[in-house]
A protein has these predicted regions:
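N-terminal secretory signal peptides and thylakoid transit peptides that target proteins
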Residues: 1-16
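Sec-dependent signal peptide cleavage junction
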Residues: 21-33
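Lipolytic serine-hydrolase domain surface
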Residues: 32-70, 81-158, 180-195, 201-293
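Alpha/beta-hydrolase fold active-site loops
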Residues: 73-74
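The conserved beta1-alpha1 loop
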Residues: 77-83, 167
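Alpha/beta-hydrolase fold nucleophile elbow
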Residues: 157-167
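Gly/Ala-rich beta-loop-alpha elbow adjacent to hydrolase catalytic centers
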Residues: 166-170, 174
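Short, hydrophobic alpha-helix immediately C-terminal to the catalytic nucleophile
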Residues: 175-179
Length: 293
């Protein structure tokens, strides 16, 4: 996929103000100091793109290095997961809190770079699967938008490292972005995502293996070091994948037994640290994650 950086950057300048105004309306602007990339309200409840947005458009809160401000030596983008319980405003606020938690945990564990949050429409859909199908669709569609972020950032800050960290369904945003970047301007110019870190990934467990060649090739070609942190007792992933996917999740079992993962892909069995706490990866593993950076 090719990316038109100039066309998008012109649009970004006018959307930043709108996101900042939204933050002010929610009462969190003064206290919230984490740089944010947002695609909130870019998708309808059925997962279709709203009028006025494109496959690669995104907004910021005016604090994102390389896009709104100067470059940083090391940039980590954190992508949150699914929200099946909250109202629209509640889902956005919960996402902001998770992003802030990620920033605090990673920096507290010694990460010296800048953590940026990526927030997306994780609360779309409804029905017997609680909107899981629509949320998956939107997560995968967000891959091109996150890829555009990486293109825009590296075009301005070519010497900086870029890393992606995801939780739960955020893994499908992350992996989709790698597929978008593979064979694009990004890799054609020799750029890479320096490391990726999947936490409790709500993603089929064959994804990083040769059984899924598009994702296998994307990990191999785009990423320097790819890590997956999983817990065999993660009961949220067990419920989702037993109920809706009839499969097993990468964040529960690790990659599918007997398959061949990408050569730059590694796993950490976090069962003893995380147990059945799907929300506990950052709290219990930040030291491990930072040591892998």
């Amino acid at each position: 996929m090719s990316f038109n950086r100039r066309t998008f950057l012109k649009r970004s300048a006018v959307t930043t103000t709108g996101l900042a105004a939204l933050a002010g309306a929610s009462g969190t602007a003064a206290a919230y100091d984490v740089p944010l990339i947002s695609t909130r309200d870019h998708y309808n409840d059925d997962g279709s793109l709203v009028s006025g947005e494109t496959q690669r458009s995104y907004d910021t809160n005016g604090l994102v290095p390389g896009i709104d401000t100067g470059c940083t030596g090391d940039l980590t983008v954190f992508i949150h997961g699914w929200d099946k319980n909250s109202s629209e405003s509640g889902a956005e606020q919960a996402a902001r809190e998770k992003i802030q938690h990620a920033r605090d945990e990673l920096t507290g564990a010694g990460y010296g770079g800048t953590v940026v949050g990526y927030t997306w429409d994780n609360d779309v859909g409804s029905g017997v699967d609680f909107g899981w199908g629509e949320a998956k669709t939107v997560a995968q569609k967000n891959g091109a938008k996150l890829a555009q972020v990486a293109v825009d950032y590296k075009s301005q800050c070519p010497e900086s490292n870029v890393r992606f960290v995801s939780h739960s369904l955020g893994a499908q945003v992350l992996l989709s972005s790698l597929r978008s970047l593979n064979g694009s301007w990004f890799t054609d110019n020799g750029y890479d995502v320096y490391s990726t870190h999947l936490l409790g990934a709500a993603q089929d467990n064959e994804a990083p293996t040769q059984e899924n060649p598009d994702t296998y090739d994307a990990i191999t070609n785009v990423v320097t070091n790819a890590y997956n942190y999983h817990s065999n007792e993660d009961d949220v992933l067990q419920w989702i994948y037993n109920s809706f996917e009839f499969d097993q999740a990468l964040g529960e079992t690790g990659y599918e037994e007997g398959k061949t993962p990408a050569p730059n892909y590694d796993e950490f069995d976090a069962t003893s640290q995380v147990g059945n706490d799907h929300s506990g990866y950052l709290t219990n593993l930040s030291d491990e994650i930072v040591s892998d950076m």
